[in-house]
Amino acid sequence: MNRILSTILVAILLMSCASKNSNDKSTTFTNEQFKTAECPQGMKINATFLDEISWDIPHQNWGVEEWDQDFRAMKDMGINTVVLIRAGLGRWIAAPFESILATEDVYYPPVDLVEMFLCLADKYDMAFYFGMYDSGKYWHEGDYLKEIDLNIKLIDEVWAKYGHHKSFQGWYLSQEVSRRTKNMTKIYAEVGRHAKEVSGNLPTMVSPYIHGVKTDQVMSGDTATTVSEHEYEWNEILSNLEGVVDILAFQDGQVDYHELYDYLVVNKKLADKYGMKCWTNFESFDRDMPIRFLPIKWEKLLLKMEMARKAGMDGAITFEFSHFMSPNSEYSQAGHLYDRYCEHFGIENKWKNR
C-alpha cells in the first residue's frame, strides 16, 4: 500500500512539473520532487572518528576555531560521540605523553589535541573515546608485549591527566586487524582489560576490517575471505575478547556492495553471541576511485546505511566526518554529502548557506 501511494505521489509531482511552462526561468525545484518511490531509508550516524594523527589522509591544518566549528556541525547532524582514532602513530603523537616521550623516538607535539578535543566534547555534550598509541612497528614485528606495555603506561597517564573531563566516556583499541593478524587479540585483551580496570569499567571499542576484495592485501594477490570463513575466524577471535570489548564496529568498505549485507548479518550475530554492541563503521570515503581518498557518492553511502538498518546494527560510526562529510571540509563534495544526509533524514541544515 505504501509503495502504491509513493508511486502515485511521484507521478503527481512529475505531472506538476510537466504542466508548467518549460521556458519559465523562474521555476524552482526541490530534490524531494525527484526522489524515487523506493528510495532506501537507511540508518543515522551517531559517531565519528577524529583522524588527526593520520595514516593516509591529508591534514586540513585546523586550529581550535576550525575544530570548534566542526564539532558544532557534527552535533547539528546528530553525532553524539567522537573517537580519537589513535594517540599517536610512529613518531607523531597527539599530545606530549610523558610515557611515550620517555621511551620512544617521537616528535614533541606543538598542540595538546587530546585536551582540545575533550574541551570541545565537553562544550557540545558529546562522548569522547580515547584511541591508543600505534607504534607502527612492535606489533608488526611480533613484539606484542612491547606494544601492550607502552599502552598500559599510556592509559595510566591519560586517565590521571584527562579523566576528570565529563566527556571522557570510553576507550578505542586502535590497532586494526583482520584475519591475518589474529595474535593482535592479545593486545586487545590486555590493553582493553587494563583500560576498563583503571577507568571504572568505561566501554571499549574496536573497528577491525573484513579481509575482502578491496583490501590492499587481496588487491595485491591474496585471497579474500568468504562469509563463512569470516564467521568461523572471528568467532574464534571474539571468544577471547568476551567481557573486554564492548563495541564491535567492523569497517564496511573492504567488501563489494552486493556482499556487504551478508557480512553485516554475521557481525551482528557474533556481537550478540559475545555480549557486545554491534556498530558498523561507515566509510564515508570512496574506495572505488583511482585517487586515495575522496568523499563517497551519496547513493553508495545510503545503500550501506540501508543494509546496516536491515541487519539491525546497534549504532553507526563513520570514518570520517571532518574530511569526507563536513560542510567545513576542504573537499567541496563533503559539504554536499552533508547536505544530502540532512535532507534525507529531515534534519535542519544550519550550514546550507555556507
Give the residues covered by each predicted segment.
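Aromatic-lined substrate-binding rim segments of carbohydrate-active enzymes
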Residues: 64-136, 184-205, 264-267
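C-terminal motif of bacterial Sec signal peptides marking the signal peptidase cleavage site
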Residues: 15-16
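Active-site cleft segment of glycoside hydrolase catalytic domains centered on the general acid/base Glu
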Residues: 138-168, 173-201, 206-208, 257-266, ...
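An active-site-proximal structural segment forming one wall of the substrate-binding cleft
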Residues: 108-124, 143-170, 194, 230-233, ...
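Acidic-and-aromatic substrate-binding clefts and catalytic sites of carbohydrate-active enzymes
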Residues: 53-67, 74, 86-93, 100-112, ...
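Aromatic-lined carbohydrate-recognition surfaces of secreted/lumenal glycan-active proteins
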Residues: 127-148, 170-176, 188-230, 247-253, ...
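Substrate-binding cleft of secreted/luminal carbohydrate-active enzymes
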Residues: 82, 249-257, 276-354
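Boundary/entry segment of secreted carbohydrate-active catalytic domains
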Residues: 26-88
